[in-house]
């Protein structure tokens, strides 16, 4: 995820990484997210990985996140985005999506008493078979459409 944001905002995928420590610059990431009015949260509070790997295909969602409760705390939120197949399934059910958007696309939904855009983004995982530049372009379009790059 942070390589994507580094590429979008700084034209450098390593901006938010500290290669010497093999970690991320947490305070810089928090500052960037706050500055651009971006909130992040998992689609599920509890999951079970059935094969012990990161694949969505064998991921059981034990407890989905209470999206309605989260959105009640963010009155200015205009969009919800998923970053993978399983999260898209979980969130689309909660949002009452009539149809799932294609990867990199969005649909407008009315959920929890408000209109929202629901984006189905490509997985940010390096294991997802899409070039980083293409992922960044999809995320850039989403951030532009939601106004997050205009702040």
Summary of predicted features, one role per range:
Residues 1-58:
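Short, surface-exposed acidic-centric catalytic microdomains
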Residues 1-2, 22-26, 37, 64, ...:
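A structural signal for well-ordered alpha-helical scaffolds and beta->alpha junctions
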Residues 4, 51-68, 93-151:
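C-terminal capping/extension of enzyme domains
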Residues 31-33, 73, 111:
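Generic structural signal for beta-strand residues in well-ordered domains
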């Amino acid at each position: 995820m942070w390589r994507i944001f580094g590429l979008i905002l700084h034209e450098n995928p390593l901006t938010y990484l500290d290669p010497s420590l093999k970690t991320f610059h947490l305070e810089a990431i928090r500052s960037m997210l706050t500055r651009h009015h971006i909130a992040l949260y998992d689609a599920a509070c509890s999951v079970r990985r059935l094969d012990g790997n990161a694949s969505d295909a064998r991921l059981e969602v034990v407890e989905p996140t209470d999206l309605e409760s989260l959105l009640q705390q963010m009155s200015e939120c205009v969009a919800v985005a998923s970053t993978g197949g399983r999260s898209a399934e979980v969130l689309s059910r909660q949002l009452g999506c009539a149809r799932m958007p294609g990867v990199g696309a969005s649909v407008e939904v009315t959920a929890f008493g408000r209109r929202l855009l629901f984006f189905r983004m490509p997985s940010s995982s390096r294991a997802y078979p899409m070039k980083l530049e293409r992922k960044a372009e999809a995320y850039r379009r989403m951030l532009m459409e939601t106004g997050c790059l205009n702040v």
